[in-house]
Amino acid sequence: MAWAAIFRASIPWSRKYNQSGELFQIEGHCRSACTLFLAIRNVCIDRNATLLFQAGHNRQREMTNSATSHMLGAYNAALREHVIAKHYMETLAFHAIFGREMIQKFGHRACPK
């Protein structure tokens, strides 16, 4: 868990929301880098959202271990284990997890209706 805490503190937008306590909502289609918002302590996920996971990459779309590790650092342990076990982080193909599953299976907070 220490790496997740370091990750959260190192990102300015994450720090802003974590300090303010303001709720950050993930809604709609959340592709790849958008999943970094999962690092925000006060994040919630809309039940109808779709989050798309893939390996981290550089600007040339070449997969890199450092970018993938950076992304994995935004995820809680259960989600991190799932995306690793399913090999989602080994390809640039998108792998969808729906908001309902993020809430029920991985313990993320549901956004208020």
Give the ranges of each region predicted by the language model.
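Extended, non-globular alpha-helical segments
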Residues: 1-19
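Charged, glycine-interspersed solvent-exposed loop segments at helix/strand-loop junctions
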Residues: 15-21, 61-113
